[in-house]
């Protein structure tokens, strides 16, 4: 069991109820003054809107749960998430098993690298948890159009642990990559259209960063765009790519880079299939390596098989 405060508990509860491996998610109030409060009193009693998450350790780890948690919060925002303000909307991780603290600390250390500001998420032993009123439980299931400050749909995207795919040193990268791969990933160059290795390949599998091996795209989201480069409607997870404004060649475009390796991948455009979200990730074949579905388990990517057709 772990207790997560991430702003309004309606969205946090609904998000975690959809995460594979979570057995139950219950809204409540935690770590305030005293063991009695309610929705009208929490701003006086100092409790945080918190979700009790019960999970199957054989299906999901605590670290994976915490990576999900950091996906849906702004960890640098004090007493504010989305449009909600007040100490009851602070972020926090409250544990009942001291052994969990080492994992929590590990995630904090990793996530601190992603932000310029200090992480202000509380981490503390659980003092008490008071179950919220019945009308708060499963609120968004009962009220599908109710207020929610997070994207619930992201719950179905896999969590990919960045620490498993560390970036090699500059020397190692130069030794590992071909001259063409190096020019594209490290010097932001673009390969030729219609003459690259994956533009017309649609076999089942995943595409990983040629530098780090971090998973980036799935064949399930690949489509024929006619542009001559591999095209995807989305990354395999929203966590694995970074975006940067690119004003080269007298154009304004959105560059796509890999998270762990910071490799230049390509650009994203808004002329993709409307029924798949409308985006087109135009990616250089030289920036990615294809892992066939049949090889994913043996190469350590078996946890992503459900993300592949």
From Swiss-Prot:
Gene Ontology molecular functions: L-methionine:thioredoxin-disulfide S-oxidoreductase activity; peptide-methionine (R)-S-oxide reductase activity; peptide-methionine (S)-S-oxide reductase activity
Keyword Glycoprotein appears in the UniProt entry: no
Reactions it catalyzes: L-methionyl-[protein] + [thioredoxin]-disulfide + H2O = L-methionyl-(S)-S-oxide-[protein] + [thioredoxin]-dithiol; [thioredoxin]-disulfide + L-methionine + H2O = L-methionine (S)-S-oxide + [thioredoxin]-dithiol; L-methionyl-[protein] + [thioredoxin]-disulfide + H2O = L-methionyl-(R)-S-oxide-[protein] + [thioredoxin]-dithiol
Enzyme Commission designation: 1.8.4.11, 1.8.4.12
Record-level GO cellular component terms: cytoplasm
Signal peptide: none
GO-annotated biological processes: protein modification process; protein repair; response to oxidative stress
Catalytic residues (UniProt): 8, 282 (nucleophile)
Domain (MsrB) ranges: 170-293
Keyword line: Multifunctional enzyme, Oxidoreductase
Highest rank taxon of the organism: Bacteria
Broad class of enzyme this protein falls into: oxidoreductase
Pfam families: PMSR, SelR
Keyword Magnesium: no
Spans annotated as Peptide methionine sulfoxide reductase A: 1-153
Family the entry assigns: In the N-terminal section; belongs to the MsrA Met sulfoxide reductase family.
NCBIfam families: msrA, peptide-methionine (R)-S-oxide reductase MsrB
Described function: Has an important function as a repair enzyme for proteins that have been inactivated by oxidation. Catalyzes the reversible oxidation-reduction of methionine sulfoxide in proteins to methionine.
Protein's recorded name: Peptide methionine sulfoxide reductase MsrA/MsrB
Gene it is expressed from: msrAB
